[in-house]
Amino acid sequence: MARYTGPAWKLSRRLGISLSGTGKELEKRPYAPGPHGPNQRKKLSEYGLQLQEKQKLRHMYGMTERQFRRTFDQAGKMPGKHGENFMILLEARLDNLVYRMGLARTRRAARQLVNHGHIMVDGARVDIPSYRVKPGQTISVREKSNSLVVVKEAIEVNNFVPEYLTFDADKLEATYTRHAERSELPAEINEALIVEFYSR
């Protein structure tokens, strides 16, 4: 299944969750798009709830189904809870951590920064958004890219960097000190439903 490239606001309203992280998509119309408006949402079956939860998380991180399922399978080989491990692996993606650093306003914008070669890991350019960052590694913006307007604007409005990142705003650099804990990850996601979906 290909990555969704349509309007983020429309998908956010359909899934009932802010994919941009700003919440603006749901401020005025917190219901699915379409002619039926707020009356369109219907009670979902157990399978429907599981599928919806999977789609919410997959689109939140901007992944294809193949990438998403591969990461899920990798999480299943780790000790501990499958669902929590899955969330932790998703959070360790390079494009996501660029977003968490506040270098981009959305994960989609962060993915573009990585794709276009503006981001380095431990001093080496990495242009693979799905690159999994390991604790202790340092993420930074290339010196030639420090003056990017999109980065400056994102930094100005960002007022929160998670505790598993130590961020230096002057250097535009952060160290991924440890894996995130479940309490630091999206509370609106029920990963148990996703585990149930793939276990069918």
Swiss-Prot record:
Gene3D superfamilies: Ribosomal Protein S4 Delta 41, Chain A, domain 1, RNA-binding S4 domain
S4 RNA-binding domain mapped to chain residues: 92-152
GO cellular component labels: small ribosomal subunit
CDD domains, sorted: S4 (cd00165)
Residues in coiled coil: none
The keyword Ribonucleoprotein is assigned to this record: yes
InterPro entries per UniProt: Ribosomal_uS4, Ribosomal_uS4_bac-type, Ribosomal_uS4_CS, Ribosomal_uS4_N, S4_RNA-bd, S4_RNA-bd_sf
An example molecular function term from Gene Ontology annotations: structural constituent of ribosome
SUPFAM superfamilies for this protein: Alpha-L RNA-binding motif
UniProt keywords, alphabetically: Ribonucleoprotein, Ribosomal protein, RNA-binding, rRNA-binding
Region Disordered, residue ranges: 22-42
Taxonomic superkingdom: Bacteria
GO biological process: ribosomal small subunit biogenesis; translation
Record's function text: One of the primary rRNA binding proteins, it binds directly to 16S rRNA where it nucleates assembly of the body of the 30S subunit. With S5 and S12 plays an important role in translational accuracy.
Family (UniProt): Belongs to the universal ribosomal protein uS4 family.
Subunit structure: Part of the 30S ribosomal subunit. Contacts protein S5. The interaction surface between S4 and S5 is involved in control of translational fidelity.
Protein name: Small ribosomal subunit protein uS4
UniProt source species: Bacillus cereus (strain ATCC 14579 / DSM 31 / CCUG 7414 / JCM 2152 / NBRC 15305 / NCIMB 9373 / NCTC 2599 / NRRL B-3711)
Organism placement in taxonomy: Bacteria, Bacillati, Bacillota, Bacilli, Bacillales
